[in-house]
């Protein structure tokens, strides 16, 4: 079989960076964020969060090839707002939202278990 070993889809090799940032020379005020060992799950949620920011003009992602375990997120912002700042803010907001979701989920489980007993 030509498929790579399953562990290659999530394990970073020695010297491999999780995220690399490259300036997009085709478009003003834009960057390409390459995230290794991730797929559509993270790409779509980050893109959606970036698009909630009014200073983000464009946000999109692609998976270069199904056997390559990485996503490339392209972000273009207004001139007074850097793509790196937009990306950092989106990640911070997502962490907050997911922490709140986890807290509510755990509370609902606890309430349900107390109701059963």
From Swiss-Prot:
It comes from Mus musculus. Component of the RNA polymerase II (Pol II) core complex consisting of 12 subunits: a ten-subunit catalytic core composed of POLR2A/RPB1, POLR2B/RPB2, POLR2C/RPB3, POLR2I/RPB9, POLR2J/RPB11, POLR2E/RPABC1, POLR2F/RPABC2, POLR2H/RPABC3, POLR2K/RPABC4 and POLR2L/RPABC5 and a mobile stalk composed of two subunits POLR2D/RPB4 and POLR2G/RPB7, protruding from the core and functioning primarily in transcription initiation. Part of Pol II(G) complex, in which Pol II core associates with an additional subunit POLR2M; unlike conventional Pol II, Pol II(G) functions as a transcriptional repressor. It is found in: Nucleus. This is DNA-directed RNA polymerase II subunit RPB11. The modification N-acetylmethionine is found at residue 1. Disulfide bonds: none annotated. Core component of RNA polymerase II (Pol II), a DNA-dependent RNA polymerase which synthesizes mRNA precursors and many functional non-coding RNAs using the four ribonucleoside triphosphates as substrates. One of its GO terms (molecular function) is protein dimerization activity. GO terms for cellular component: nucleoplasm; nucleus; RNA polymerase II, core complex. GO terms for biological process: transcription by RNA polymerase II. InterPro entries: RBP11, RBP11-like, RBP11-like_dimer, RNA_pol_Rpb11_13-16kDa_CS, Rpo11-like. It holds the Pfam family RNA_pol_L_2. Keywords: Acetylation, DNA-directed RNA polymerase, Nucleus, Transcription. Belongs to the archaeal Rpo11/eukaryotic RPB11/RPC19 RNA polymerase subunit family. SUPFAM superfamilies: RBP11-like subunits of RNA polymerase (SSF55257).
């Amino acid at each position: 079989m030509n498929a790579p070993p399953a562990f290659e889809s999530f394990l970073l090799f020695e010297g491999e960076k999780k995220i690399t940032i490259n300036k997009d020379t085709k478009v003003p005020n834009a960057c390409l964020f390459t995230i290794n060992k991730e797929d559509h799950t993270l790409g779509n949620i980050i893109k959606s969060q970036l698009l909630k920011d009014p200073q983000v003009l464009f946000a999109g992602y692609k998976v270069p090839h199904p056997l390559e375990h990485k996503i490339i997120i392209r972000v273009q912002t207004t001139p007074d707002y850097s793509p790196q700042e937009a990306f950092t803010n989106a990640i911070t907001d997502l962490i907050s939202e997911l922490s709140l979701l986890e807290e509510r989920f755990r509370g609902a489980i606890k309430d349900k278990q107390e109701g059963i007993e």
